[in-house]
Amino acid sequence: MIVKVSNLGGSGIAEMPSSKSFTQRYVLASAFLNKSVVLNGITITNDDDVAMRIAESVGSTITINNRSIKISSNFKCPEEIYVGESGTSYRLSIGLLAASGCVTRIKGEDSLAKRPIEPLLMALGENGVKFERNEAGFYNVDGRNSQKKHVEIEGSSSQFVSSLMLYYAKKGGGEFTARNIKSIGYVYITKRVLYDLGYFANIERTITINPTGVWKTAIDVEPDYSSMAFFMVLGLLSDSVDVRFRIKRISRIQPDSVILDLFKNNILINGEEIRVISGINEPVSVDADMNPDLCPPLSVIGIFSKYGVQIRNYERLKTKESNRYEGIIDLAERFGANVEDNGQDLFIKPGSVRFPDVISYKDHRMIMAASIASLIGGFPTVIENAEKTAKSFPGFFAELSKFANVEELA
């Protein structure tokens, strides 16, 4: 899909999608752990749909009713699962399949097969799980001899740690050691999901999982703060829009909820409503190790705010769905911003502003960042591959149309 964005201005409540980090974990854990549940407040992203298809392949029946999903679990080992381009579903499913004693072939998109997985395979291998790389670049899992010994894992991805947490939950409990956990906030999301489904996780250097015997049958899934960031940036950089959000329960479990702290002087909270006040009055700094998904939207601030943006520990961005380190630099330079790289951090500041006529990315977050930058720049811009935003935010352009003109060209 190709769209043109222009004419920024308007007032409204931007409706955010549910957190796919929570949703995918709830769906997969419910299906594999045989805990039937109703999830409320759901927006089905492409990644959520992948998790739901995996749940169906392991015997669950899924019923969708408006923004609720009912998962009726009846676990069975699948011969094959398809993980699309969802790193979360891929990595979490490996641990769950292994713990379940399954012999399963995994398929997915080529781009995902290239992303790191080895630390997880090594840790599971120490527990007797066998892996064989298939012609698609993914791994066939053989968990028939899986055990629950104490192992160690390198936490270079929080998804590796979360996968092991689910592994030991499926095994009825256990413990393991995690070293140097990156983006630990996502591990706490997994802890919350396990707690809601009847398991207590104690997270220290040694992570311990134990069943509690009590779980919820209906769960409200909170909205996604990384998606909120795009519209927050829109409101921060423009006084021609009045951007508001409505959140039933403001939770701080999601790592990306840090945006409420970063811009505490620019938001007004009144009950369930959050209102964005325009104006950036100080430099913005974000840690890519902790909040990689905030880097694309916040980089737009660097393009237009005289105070600039610092993206710390940018190496993390190179192993996301695309090389977002390169994508962020490309976007900034397209709009004429100055970018400095000291080998660890990126610094983005305004330069001689340019206005690209057409912008084309394949990464969903870069497409959304480009759309926001185009509107702040004030020049009509054609955005290609607009459909790819459905990976995390299916209604992005519908919500954007509350504050600008969005014309579908093809």
Swiss-Prot record:
Enzyme Commission designation: 2.5.1.19
Keyword hit for Disulfide bond: no
CDD domains in UniProt: EPSP_synthase (cd01556)
Residue positions binding 3-phosphoshikimate: 20-21, 25, 157-159, 183, 293, 320
Entry annotation: catalytic residues: 293
Binding residues annotated for phosphoenolpyruvate, in chain numbering: 20, 87, 115, 159, 324, 365, 391
A GO CC annotation given for this chain: cytoplasm
Subunit architecture: Monomer.
Family that this chain belongs to: Belongs to the EPSP synthase family.
Task performed by this protein: Catalyzes the transfer of the enolpyruvyl moiety of phosphoenolpyruvate (PEP) to the 5-hydroxyl of shikimate-3-phosphate (S3P) to produce enolpyruvyl shikimate-3-phosphate and inorganic phosphate.
The protein's name: 3-phosphoshikimate 1-carboxyvinyltransferase
